[in-house]
Swiss-Prot record:
Pathway recorded for this protein: Cofactor biosynthesis; adenosylcobalamin biosynthesis; cob(II)yrinate a,c-diamide from sirohydrochlorin (anaerobic route): step 8/10
EC number assigned by the record: 2.1.1.196
Keywords: Cobalamin biosynthesis, Methyltransferase, S-adenosyl-L-methionine, Transferase
Gene Ontology biological process terms from the UniProt entry: anaerobic cobalamin biosynthetic process; methylation
Protein name: Probable cobalt-precorrin-6B C(15)-methyltransferase (decarboxylating)
Origin: domain of life: Archaea
NCBIfam families: CbiT
Protein family according to the UniProt entry: Belongs to the methyltransferase superfamily. Archaeal-type CbiT family.
Organism: Methanococcus vannielii (strain ATCC 35089 / DSM 1224 / JCM 13029 / OCM 148 / SB)
Length: 180
């Protein structure tokens, strides 16, 4: 995994943290022939990591700043097997032929998941921060007859203080893996 500090960053554009990327990439079970859709690409952390393991990546985001940041990180890490698209994922999914998808964030999550299902995407990994979004995603996936695995991950980093080391936690992330 590439260290978070190595990525180009822009205030207001999120990046999936290194440890969460590691778990999410593993849950995608990427094969060299896979073509993967990264929805809500943000800073391009997952886009870059995924691209090193698969045939091709399509990255989508509704933020121009996110698109620009992803493109800068693709350039920095010499990613050539990826195309980046600005817009609403629900309107763009029909343009892509993919077999796996990662969702790091998006509007219209129900429509997005339904469209992925219609395109026979059989492995979807979805990261959520908001508890209600996790519940909503699980309900949608169950309705569509996906097999679901749900894990909650809390990453803490050690910080040296005068009396020893203190653990500082980041936001807990729910990682939902859906398969058919």
């Amino acid at each position: 995994m590439i260290k978070d500090s190595e990525f180009y960053r822009l205030d207001g554009v999120p990046i999936t943290k290194e440890e969460i990327r590691a778990i999410s990439v593993e849950k995608l079970n990427i094969c060299p022939e896979d073509i993967i859709l990264d929805i809500g690409c943000g800073s391009g952390g997952m886009t870059v990591e995924i691209s090193k393991r698969c045939k091709f990546v399509y990255a989508v985001d509704g933020s121009k700043d996110a698109i620009d940041t992803t493109l800068k990180n693709m350039d920095k890490f010499n990613v050539k097997n990826c195309e980046v698209y600005f817009g609403d994922a629900k309107d763009l999914i029909s343009n892509f032929k993919v077999n796996k998808a990662f969702i790091g964030g998006t509007q219209n999550i129900e429509s997005v998941i339904e469209k992925l299902n219609e395109k026979n995407v059989r492995n979807i990994v979805i990261n959520t921060i908001v508890l209600e979004n996790s519940v909503k995603v699980i309900q949608i996936l169950e309705r569509l007859n996906f097999s679901i695995e749900v894990i909650s991950v809390l990453i803490s980093y050690g910080k040296r203080i005068s009396s020893g080391h203190m653990m500082l936690s980041k936001n807990p992330i729910t990682i939902i893996t859906a398969k058919k």
